[in-house]
């Protein structure tokens, strides 16, 4: 054969049907169907030999479509579940949904015409809310499945199912019997816009809230015995000065609180005297715009039990002590309304003050507020109180004050604190046990422990009652005559059994007689049933009892709870409180939290900014597919693995493009590996470790390092380490180094040559371990790779094959070997820089048109390098040769650096005390392998071939 190109057919080019493109929109659903039909999740969750691993799902709210935060959350959970499944553990994941509560009720009401609303009964509203919730669950479920998330999708837990509601009533009952549930008139967060009490978890604190703050004086009417001696000369012109950001609470004022440890000053103003904190005098002079000369000072403690006159009502109130009073703002004296504040309530109880809350459920003043009755407290009520104080000369100053103020998380309207009859869980009763339980849990990241500890330490009792219809009823009856609640083991167990059978609708459907146990029917008393439902945080907070304790093969406590960092205040806490109150332990062993998803500039996502990333559009593509290409689920999942989820994480179009590029690199690497294994069967063709060339042993050492790091990334839940390591392995170790060098062995050798089979052995190990290692994160790609393995395998799915398998013998190679290849890689970099200059200057085209000259100063090292540079004809099956490592046709080791001086300086390089250079290769180009050789043209039969290729052709 003497025609150029005649040897094309003799080269072993890659062969695989594995697609270069993911075509995710079509291929991912096919792979999901394959998993479903073969019941991969079901089989492994039951048949894996290891211990169970139970990650308990925090239920998303069945209200609307999924957003990118849902995707981040569910994908993180799935990565962890799939990893432990590959590790052989029995992973059972039961997804859940939170189905009750005001937001769903509001959605249903918003979708109705006014005449439909007017005709609503509690039961018809509940039916509509249930239908809405179930439709939403179905829609969200399909989206979650499309993300590639595995779980018990045919049997999820829903907080509206009878068995769940019954278990929840059981938790409530246990807390009642332990004395932790009580009814009381207490200030609670009340939403006038929703007309219900709210838990702290249902509040948000938007930026930019401004209140009307006022400084007010109350005239002192009597002094305590301890204050008399110091202050009697200043009466009757002595007043206390208070500051408040809620003028509407002044009608509820019953006391003024001081800090017993602060010093207070009497200052002169306009011919009368004000009592204020001594260290705030200067600041108040600036605020009020007047000089306030100090007349005398007195200890806060000495003022206890002095009295003052309310400026707007005919009543007097005491000065009381509160260590929560600070000098951060205001006057150092705090207006106290026990019906409108938590600290006010506590101090009021201590001093035996009544609870006055002259505000109704609509947020309007009641008759108790006298002249203000009927006014909306947050609007005209505020204004009217300020005007009234002005008229009686009690207003010292009004100014705008920007601060964090609670809003209803659903209606986005401000809330108020208002005393109402509510049901509470007494956190005080088990706070210490809860704090001890927190300390037993592993928190990831660690600062989560401090957050939830502070919250539980400081939290007030939990208001668990809601004045709405769509929820689980508080199973209480009230005596018609006395109003006394009837709530005991017998009544709770009876209602629980009914709910287990008929669902919580029974509370509205059945008569009082049917809901009461036999002993309480016809006993001479008349009862009415309560109308309150439970806080939805009590619903989801009971999931450990309704799911973990009830279902076979689940475990309580769970291995892990995983949600957004806002759940320290929400689900983590409500679950902890119910579990500790009833069992004395936390319901979880580990709690992992993630941040929120922001845009690429670090801003919150909002429709108004146009920066919302919709996971459905990321996966399926948008209307304009150029603008919003269909990336598929794996690229979304790859993004999840790339971020440090312990704080807020960015996402946008540029980041998605980067992810697609990285995904493509991993996919193309896998495709190259598959293509070059088309004629390899490990059962027959693999080469044993001790026969492998040095390069291959070095590569196996790198494989051990890489996959050990990947494993540590998964066990420590630091998935960004996985992302960086796998990306680096595919690009730097494989594509740019090993596979670059391997092409010559793979394509040019005879199919069954040792140098080719040894390389394929490494490719096989790299490919299978790569597929297994990426399976938790990009399961569709991993499965796709596995389905295209060109040799028989006993495992029909990558997930059945288990986790990466690394042989201990690969881990301890000769240190000399490692040092040599670290040097080779550094030297390659230097050589490539010079080759690029030759290319730019059109001296050469491909690197095989070049020859490398090396001068090694150290004689010992020179001998080592000489061993890697045999004469051309000596190593027909060579692998460990410098020319292959550098992808050049020849390498010459020089005896003196002087021989480099003839080269242009730009074609020379230094490394350490050695040096080298690059110049065009000797000889002619071989038509088969494209290496240059002085042998080309010397073989009569194969004039166009080099000595290596002639040897292959003559076999």
From Swiss-Prot:
NCBIfam families in UniProt: ileS
Source taxon at top rank: Bacteria
Gene: ileS
Cross-referenced SUPFAM superfamilies: Anticodon-binding domain of a subclass of class I aminoacyl-tRNA synthetases, Nucleotidylyl transferase, ValRS/IleRS/LeuRS editing domain
Official protein name in the record: Isoleucine--tRNA ligase
Location of this chain's protein in the cell: Cytoplasm
Keyword Glycoprotein: no
Residues reported to bind ATP: 607
This enzyme's EC code(s): 6.1.1.5
GO cellular component, as recorded: cytoplasm
Main location: cytoplasm
Motif ('HIGH' region): 60-70
One GO process term, biological-process aspect: isoleucyl-tRNA aminoacylation
Catalytic reaction(s) noted: tRNA(Ile) + L-isoleucine + ATP = L-isoleucyl-tRNA(Ile) + AMP + diphosphate
Function: Catalyzes the attachment of isoleucine to tRNA(Ile). As IleRS can inadvertently accommodate and process structurally similar amino acids such as valine, to avoid such errors it has two additional distinct tRNA(Ile)-dependent editing activities. One activity is designated as 'pretransfer' editing and involves the hydrolysis of activated Val-AMP. The other activity is designated 'posttransfer' editing and involves deacylation of mischarged Val-tRNA(Ile).
Free-text domain note: IleRS has two distinct active sites: one for aminoacylation and one for editing. The misactivated valine is translocated from the active site to the editing site, which sterically excludes the correctly activated isoleucine. The single editing site contains two valyl binding pockets, one specific for each substrate (Val-AMP or Val-tRNA(Ile)).
Pfam families, per the entry: Anticodon_1, tRNA-synt_1, zf-FPG_IleRS
Any one Gene Ontology molecular-function term assigned to this protein's record: isoleucine-tRNA ligase activity
Keyword annotations of the record: Aminoacyl-tRNA synthetase, ATP-binding, Cytoplasm, Ligase, Metal-binding, Nucleotide-binding, Protein biosynthesis, Zinc
Residues involved in Zn(2+) binding: 926, 929, 946, 949
Cited InterPro entries: aa-tRNA-synth_I_CS (IPR001412), aa-tRNA-synth_Ia (IPR002300), Anticodon_Ile_BEm (IPR033708), Ile-tRNA-ligase (IPR002301), Ile-tRNA-ligase_type1 (IPR023585), Ile-tRNA_ligase (IPR050081), M/V/L/I-tRNA-synth_anticd-bd (IPR013155), Rossmann-like_a/b/a_fold (IPR014729)
Cofactor binding comment, as recorded: Binds 1 zinc ion per subunit.
Lineage: Bacteria, Bacillati, Cyanobacteriota, Cyanophyceae, Gomontiellales
């Amino acid at each position: 054969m003497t025609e150029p190109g005649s040897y094309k057919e003799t080269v072993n080019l890659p062969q695989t049907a594995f697609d270069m493109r993911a075509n995710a929109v079509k291929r991912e659903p096919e792979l999901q169907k394959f998993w479903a039909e073969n019941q991969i999740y079901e089989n492994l969750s039951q048949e894996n030999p290891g211990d169970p691993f139970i990650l308990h799902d925090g239920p998303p709210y069945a209200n609307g479509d999924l957003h990118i935060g849902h995707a981040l959350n569910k994908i993180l959970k799935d990565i962890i579940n799939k990893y432990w499944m590959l590790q052989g553990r029995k992973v059972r994941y039961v997804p859940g949904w939170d189905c009750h509560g005001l937001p769903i009720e509001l959605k249903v009401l918003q979708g109705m015409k006014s005449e439909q609303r007017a005709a609503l009964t509690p039961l018809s509203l509940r039916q509509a809310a249930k239908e809405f919730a179930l439709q939403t669950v179905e829609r969200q479920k399909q989206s979650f499945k499309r993300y590639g998330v595995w779980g018990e999708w045919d049997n999820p837990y829903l907080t509206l199912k009878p068995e769940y509601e019954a278990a929840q009533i059981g938790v409530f009952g246990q807390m009642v019997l332990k004395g932790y549930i009580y009814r009381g008139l207490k200030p609670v967060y009340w939403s006038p816009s929703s007309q219900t009490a709210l838990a702290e978890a249902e509040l948000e604190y938007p930026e930019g809230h401004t209140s009307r703050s006022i400084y007010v004086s109350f005239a002192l009417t009597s002094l305590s015995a301890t204050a008399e001696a110091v202050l009697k000369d200043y009466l009757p012109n002595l007043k206390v000065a208070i500051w408040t950001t809620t003028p509407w609470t002044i009608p509820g004022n019953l006391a003024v609180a001081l800090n017993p440890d602060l010093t207070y000053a009497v200052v002169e103003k306009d011919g009368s005297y004000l009592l204020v904190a001594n260290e705030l005098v200067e600041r108040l002079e600036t605020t009020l715009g007047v000089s306030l000369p100090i007349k005398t000072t007195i200890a806060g403690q000495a003022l206890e039990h002095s009295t003052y006159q309310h400026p707007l009502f005919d009543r007097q109130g005491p000065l009381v002590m509160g260590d929560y009073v600070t000098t951060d703002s205001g006057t150092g004296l705090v207006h106290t309304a026990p019906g409108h504040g938590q600290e006010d309530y506590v101090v009021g109880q201590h001093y035996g003050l009544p609870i006055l809350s002259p505000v109704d459920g609509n947020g309007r003043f009641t008759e108790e507020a006298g002249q203000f009755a009927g006014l909306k407290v947050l609007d005209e009520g505020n204004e009217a109180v300020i005007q009234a104080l002005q008229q009686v000369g009690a207003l010292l100053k009004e100014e705008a004050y920007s601060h964090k103020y609670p809003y209803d998380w659903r209606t986005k309207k401000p809330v108020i604190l208002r005393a109402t009859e509510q049901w509470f869980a007494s956190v005080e009763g088990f706070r210490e046990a809860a704090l001890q339980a927190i300390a037993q849990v592993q928190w990831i990241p660690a600062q989560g422990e401090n957050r939830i500890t502070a919250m539980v330490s400081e939290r007030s009792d939990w208001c668990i009652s809601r004045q709405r219809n769509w929820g689980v009823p508080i199973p209480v009856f009230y005596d018609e005559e006395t109003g006394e609640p009837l709530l005991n083991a017998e009544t709770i167990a009876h209602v629980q059994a009914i709910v287990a059978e008929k669902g919580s609708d029974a509370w509205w459907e059945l008569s009082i007689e049917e809901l009461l146990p036999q002993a309480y029917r016809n006993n001479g008393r008349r009862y009415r049933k309560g109308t309150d439902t439970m806080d939805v945080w009590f619903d989801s907070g009971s999931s450990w009892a309704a799911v973990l304790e009830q279902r076979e093969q689940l475990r309580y406590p769970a291995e892990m709870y995983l949600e957004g960092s806002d759940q320290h205040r929400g689900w983590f806490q409500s679950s902890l409180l119910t579990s500790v109150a009833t069992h004395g332990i936390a319901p979880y062993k580990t709690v992992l939290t993630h941040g929120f998803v922001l845009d690429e500039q670090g801003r919150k996502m909002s429709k108004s900014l146009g920066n919302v990333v919709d996971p459905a559009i990321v996966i399926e593509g948008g209307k304009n597919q150029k603008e919003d290409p269909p990336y598929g689920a794996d690229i979304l999942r790859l993004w999840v693995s790339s971020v440090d989820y312990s704080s807020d994480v960015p996402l946008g179009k540029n980041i998605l493009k980067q992810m697609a590029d990285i995904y493509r690199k991993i996919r193309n690497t896998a495709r190259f590996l598959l293509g070059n294994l088309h004629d390899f069967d490990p059962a027959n063709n693999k080469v044993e470790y001790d026969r492998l060339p040095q390069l291959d042993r070095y590569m196996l050492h790198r494989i051990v390092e890489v996959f050990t790091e990947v494993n540590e990334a998964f066990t420590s839940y630091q998935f960004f380490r996985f992302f960086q390591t796998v990306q680096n392995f595919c690009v730097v170790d494989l594509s740019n180094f090993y596979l670059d060098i391997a092409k010559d062995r793979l394509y040019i050798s005879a199919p069954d040559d040792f140098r080719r089979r040894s390389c394929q052995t490494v490719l096989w190990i790299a490919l299978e371990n790569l597929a297994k290692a990426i399976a938790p994160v990009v399961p569709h790609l991993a499965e796709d790779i596995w389905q295209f393995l060109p040799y028989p395998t006993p495992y029909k799915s990558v997930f059945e094959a288990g986790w990466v398998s690394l042989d201990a013998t690969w881990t301890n190679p000769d240190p000399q070997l490692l040092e040599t290849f670290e040097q080779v890689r550094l030297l390659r970099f230097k050589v490539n820089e010079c080759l690029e200059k030759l290319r730019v200057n059109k001296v050469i085209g491909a690197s095989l048109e070049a020859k490398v000259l090396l001068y090694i100063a150290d004689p010992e090292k020179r001998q080592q390098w000489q061993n890697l540079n045999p004469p051309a004809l000596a190593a027909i099956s060579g692998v460990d040769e410098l020319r292959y490592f550098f992808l050049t046709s020849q390498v010459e080791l020089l005896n003196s650096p002087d021989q480099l001086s003839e080269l242009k300086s730009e074609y020379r390089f230094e490394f350490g005390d050695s040096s080298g250079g690059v110049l065009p290769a000797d000889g002619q180009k071989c038509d088969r392998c494209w290496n240059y050789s002085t042998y080309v043209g010397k073989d009569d039969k194969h004039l166009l071939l080099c000595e290596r290729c002639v040897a292959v052709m003559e076999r």
